[in-house]
């Protein structure tokens, strides 16, 4: 089977038309190809065709790159959607009763994520958020070297992993949650049966675990398998631990809670939250909605299953940091480590 290496990954072609489509994606990507191939650039944000930003070394930087026009950018996104078979706007077989999809959420062959919106919901024009897949998995020592956390914090988390604690990593977009989870997973015994579940595969660690399985639940036309369905399916695969890429819905939270109470230990998940306390509240609300519990009961159930919350933060002032590590107890949240923004130092509260 014929294949070709592109900047966005290697592709094996089923037919010549498929190669033409990928060739066109690469060709039309020319305005940002230098940004995409820069190993120091982690994210590319296209706010409008002529308003492009990147994240480099943890900092937001405006660049002079631009597409020729709004129509050129829009055509590139439509081509990506068609080639990757993702719903976006009106497809070729569109019927009047069909829904229009103004948001594209897709993954390049190498795992880079691309999210785009049409002018239907971003009136100034097509917007794009492109998160590049890292070329190498960072080590714990490298994260310490980047001042993302301290050796003491890393040792604490490593011990928690080996004690099979259930850990939730929370933070804003681009705060390093996935990177840190990847490091934590590689602290695990390579002989365990680990199952990862993600909307879009980003962890890419299963090759290190001979018994491991990776589930993915991307949006696909006529495919009835969302994140909650995949999480539930892990129970029948006899996992030793389950890692869920990100919980964003009540049904996914309920399915994850069900896994945690079913005898599987050392589980990990991530979600968006601005503090450990708000993470508990958010998880409780999700569980309340999906399970029909009162909020008080849902919060109690969450506290019983979550052992540690790791707060990650991306801040324009000081970049990426683990801003807090908190132990979850029945009646309190106990801060173990925190980052002092005023003094720019980490504190050990033990």
Task: Kindly label every feature range from the protein language model.
Residues 1-62:
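N-terminal anchoring/assembly modules that precede and organize ATP-driven motor systems
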Residues 169-171:
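Hydrophobic anchor at the beta1->P-loop junction of P-loop NTPases
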Residues 174:
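Walker A (P-loop) phosphate-binding loop of P-loop NTPases
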